[in-house]
UniProtKB/Swiss-Prot annotation:
Residues 1-18 form the signal peptide. Disruption phenotype: Abolishes the production of chaetoglobosin A. Its EC number is 5.5.1.-. Pathway: Secondary metabolite biosynthesis. One of its GO terms (molecular function) is isomerase activity. Glycans are attached at residues 84, 132. This is Diels-Alderase cheD. It comes from Chaetomium globosum (strain ATCC 6205 / CBS 148.51 / DSM 1962 / NBRC 6347 / NRRL 1970) (Soil fungus). InterPro entries: DA_C. Diels-Alderase; part of the gene cluster that mediates the biosynthesis of chaetoglobosin A which has a unique inhibitory activity against actin polymerization in mammalian cells. Chaetoglobosin A and its intermediates are involved in the morphological differentiation of C.globosum. The first step of the pathway is the synthesis of prochaetoglobosin I via condensation of one acetyl-CoA, 8 malonyl-CoA, and a L-tryptophan molecule by the PKS-NRPS hybrid synthetase cheA, followed by reduction of backbone double bond to install desired geometry by the enoyl reductase cheB. Belongs to the Diels-Alderase family.
C-alpha cells in the first residue's frame, strides 16, 4: 500500500478515454466483468462526473480545496480537488502469484510531492517480479489524468504521448481491472474481491460512524482487501500470465508521506476458505501513535476484526510478529524472512494463525540510514488452530522512513482559519 509506486495537462476528450481500453482483454475473461453490459459509450453518459487534471494543474496560494473526510464518500472518486502544494492521493493495485514467486504493483498518482522525481504532479508506476528473481519497472509521468465516476463504477485513465494506463472498478467495489498500453508493456489484470472494503478500524464500508483517518492527516481505505486475481500481460515482448492473490487500496494525505508517517506494515493472505489482512501505521506527527487493525474472512464473510494488538482475556485481539531464519529477506537492515499473524477471540473461544514465508522481493527502496521499504511475495499456511491447515499466497510490505533525509522534508503547515476563506 503502497510503496511500490511511492518512489520508483491537457484535457482529453471523452472519445480518447473510451478508446484507451484496447488491451487484448482475453475473451474468456469477459464473464468476469459486469460492466460490459453498460455498452461502449457508458463512460460518456450524462450520469457520470468527470475529473480531469493535467500534469501541472494545481491550486495556487493557500486557498481551500476539497479534501475527503466523510466516511461515506465514494471510495474510488477523487479525494482531493484540485491539488494543492502539500497533499496528494493514489489508487493502488497489487497482486502475488499462487506460488508466491511473482508479483505486480500499479500506482496511479495525483501528487505534487513527487514532482522532484519527474515532471509534473502525475505519476504512474508499474512493477513486476519474475520467477528468475529479476524485476520489470516502468515509471511514467503522464501529461493528463481523467477519473470518471458513474452510478455503475469508476474509470481512471493516465495518459502520455505514447502510453496509457486504465483502471476500472465496479460501484460495489467487488471487481476491478487494470489495463496498460505502452511500448514495452501491454495487457490487463482483473481481480474479484473476497472481502468487503474496510476502514482503518476494521469496520466494513459503508459505515457512517467510521473514520478514514488512520494517523493524523493520513487517510486510508482498503477498497479490496483481498481478491482472486488474474494477470495477462506482455512485457519486453515476453508473455507473463498467472493467477493468485490481489488487492486494491486508496490513500490520500494532507501532507507528504514523510510528514505523516514514521512506519507502516501491510499483509494480506489467502489460504483455503480464509482471507486475512493486517495493516499498521506509526505516526510521524503524533509521536508514539500506533494504529494496527486485522480482519479475517471465511468464504467471503468477515468473521473476525480487531484493532487490539495485545493479549486480552475478554476482547478479540491479533498479534503480528516477524520471523527469522528463512531464505529471503530484504537488503535493508531489517532481516525478517517472514511473519506470524495470530488472531484470538476469547468470547468465541476461537483462534486462527497464519505463518508467512517470504519467497521473493517484489519491490524495494532504500531511503537511507539502512531503512526504506520492501514488498515480499510469499506463501502462507494456516487456519483455525487445531483444525485443517491451508496453504496459499501472501503479500507483505514494510516501510520505515529515515529520521533525517536530504530528499524528503516535512511540508506541514498550519491551517488558516476557514472564516478567512483560506487554508
Amino acid at each position: 500500500m503502497k510503496l511500490c509506486a511511492l518512489f520508483a495537462g491537457a484535457v482529453i476528450s471523452t472519445s480518447a478515454v473510451a478508446a484507451s481500453w484496447e488491451y487484448a482483454w482475453p475473451e474468456e475473461w469477459h464473464q468476469e466483468w459486469p460492466l460490459d453490459e453498460q455498452g461502449p459509450d457508458a463512460w460518456s453518459s450524462s450520469e457520470c462526473t468527470v475529473s480531469r487534471l493535467d500534469a501541472f494543474e494545481m491550486e495556487k496560494g493557500r486557498k481551500p480545496v476539497f479534501f475527503s473526510t466523510d466516511p461515506l464518500d465514494d471510495p474510488e472518486a477523487p479525494k482531493m480537488l484540485p491539488l494543492n502544494s502539500t497533499g496528494g492521493e493514489q489508487w493502488e493495485f497489487d497482486g502475488v502469484s499462487e506460488d508466491g514467486q511473482m508479483a505486480f504493483c500499479f500506482g496511479f498518482y495525483r501528487d505534487p510531492n513527487y514532482a522532484i522525481l519527474g515532471t509534473g504532479n502525475l505519476r504512474l508506476s508499474a512493477e513486476f517480479s519474475r520467477p528468475n528473481k529479476t524485476r520489470f519497472v516502468r515509471v511514467d509521468y503522464p501529461s493528463s489524468s481523467t477519473v470518471t465516476s458513474c452510478p455503475w463504477g469508476t474509470r481512471g485513465v493516465w495518459k502520455g504521448a505514447d502510453y496509457s494506463y486504465t483502471f476500472e472498478v465496479t460501484r460495489d467495489i467487488k471487481v476491478a481491472r487494470i489495463g496498460v498500453d505502452a511500448p514495452d508493456l501491454k495487457g490487463s489484470v482483473v481481480m474479484r474481491s473476497v472481502m468487503p472494503p474496510r476502514y482503518p478500524d476494521g469496520s466494513t464500508y459503508p459505515n457512517k460512524e467510521a473514520s478514514t483517518e488512520v494517523v493524523p492527516y493520513f487517510r486510508w481505505l482498503e477498497a479490496i482487501p483481498a481478491a482472486d486475481v488474474r494477470v495477462d500481460v506482455v512485457m519486453d515482448g515476453q508473455p507473463y500470465r498467472w493467477s493468485g492473490l490481489g488487492g486494491h487500496e486508496r490513500l490520500w494525505t494532507a501532507f507528504s508521506w514523510f510528514t505523516c508517517l514514521q512506519a507502516m506494515t501491510a499483509v494480506r493472505v489467502k489460504a483455503g476458505p480464509f482471507a486475512a489482512v493486517h495493516g499498521s501505521f506509526v505516526s510521524a506527527i503524533d509521536k508514539g501513535l500506533y494504529r494496527p487493525s486485522t480482519v479475517l474472512a471465511e468464504n467471503d464473510e468477515v468473521i473476525f476484526s480487531t484493532t487490539l494488538h495485545e493479549p486480552s482475556d475478554t476482547e478479540d485481539y491479533a498479534v503480528f510478529t516477524k520471523t527469522y531464519g528463512g531464505r529471503v529477506s530484504g537488503n535493508l537492515k531489517e532481516k525478517a524472512t517472514g511473519y506470524e499473524l495470530v488472531m484470538v477471540s476469547p468470547s468465541a473461544k476461537k483462534q486462527w494463525s497464519f505463518s508467512i514465508t517470504n519467497e521473493a522481493i517484489g519491490f524495494e527502496y532504500m531511503l537511507g540510514e539502512g531503512v526504506g521499504g520492501t514488498g515480499f511475495s510469499g506463501r502462507a499456511v494456516g487456519g483455525s488452530i487445531g483444525l485443517k491447515q491451508y496453504f496459499g499466497p501472501s503479500f507483505a510490505e514494510t516501510l520505515e522512513f529515515p529520521k533525517r533525509s536530504y530528499l524528503f522534508k516535512s511540508n506541514y503547515v498550519d491551517a488558516v482559519p476557514e472564516e478567512k476563506g483560506e487554508l
